[in-house]
Amino acid sequence: MFSSDENLFNFIVFFILVMAFPTFILCQFFTSPYGKHYTSADSGTTISPPIAWAFMESPTLWLTIIVFRLGKNYTNPLAFLLISPYLFHYTNRTIIYPLRLRSRNTKNNFPLNIAVTAFIFNLLNAYIQSRWVSHYANYQEDDWFWVRFGIGLVIFGSGMLLNIWADGVLLGLKSQGGGYKIPRGGLFDYVSSPNYLGEIMEWLGWALMTWSWAGLAFFVYTCANLVPRAVSNHKWYLQKFGEDYPKNRKAVFPFLY
């Protein structure tokens, strides 16, 4: 079907970019039933959330490393530098975050079909991100590399810190027992899902650092997936807590949306 690696690479980039649109539309009407949106009636076979997160995010580590070593630029220090933020994020998401979940005695309520779907997406995405950085990026003729990398890294790093902090707040509330509570403090005073805002910022920074269609496709798909889910989270909080929930909060972008 594909006459060359470049054709395969371009097809996957195009596929992810195009799939962002139907994903965004679908997410207006259907919220994936995990986390606070879990319902046993809609979920089918379920597994432990820590196992689900470790499984579905795992290609972002092992496949990234395998593909990276196959690229013509894998010995280039700039390629190592560029892939590092990506690996930092997914080390947290694949290893550290599941361990933090495990310590909270979570129930087996993560749908297996969602974990498998996310695993497949991460296979495709890890391939194109690692392949671009290690093989197709032209470091020798990129005069703006350091400018874009510096600005992108600031955005990425700020988003990652926000994402980790917000996850910590939510996990801390869960560990208190007694059901869901209203998260407060920091950006939780402005949006219902600062963890999603942080992740959107990360992949905006990544798209800027890589300056590639692969990075852009990932950022666009992230927005298509997380923005509607943030809106669903916001509606869920309003329905659950009613008048007690702060009315000035937005869903994901402070003061805007």
Swiss-Prot record:
Q: Name one matching Pfam family.
A: Steroid_dh
Which key words are in the record?
A: Membrane, NADP, Oxidoreductase, Transmembrane, Transmembrane helix
The answer on whether this UniProt entry bears the keyword Amino-acid biosynthesis reads no
UniProt-listed GO biological process terms: brassinosteroid biosynthetic process
- Where expressed (tissues)? Mostly expressed in leaves and hypocotyls and, to a lower extent, in stems, cotyledons, roots, seeds and callus.
Q: Which GO terms describe its cellular component?
A: membrane
**What GO molecular-function term can you cite, just one?**
oxidoreductase activity
Query: What EC number(s) has UniProt assigned to this enzyme?
Result: 1.3.1.22
Recorded hits in PROSITE patterns, A to Z, give: S5A_REDUCTASE
What compartments host this protein?
Membrane
Q: Which residues cross the membrane?
A: 11-31, 47-67, 78-97, 110-130, 151-171, 200-220
Q: In which pathway does it act?
A: Plant hormone biosynthesis; brassinosteroid biosynthesis
Q: Which PANTHER family match?
A: 3-OXO-5-ALPHA-STEROID 4-DEHYDROGENASE (PTHR10556), STEROID 5-ALPHA-REDUCTASE DET2 (PTHR10556:SF53)
> Which family does the entry's similarity section mention?
Belongs to the steroid 5-alpha reductase family.
Specify the protein name: Steroid 5-alpha-reductase DET2
Origin species: Solanum lycopersicum (Tomato)
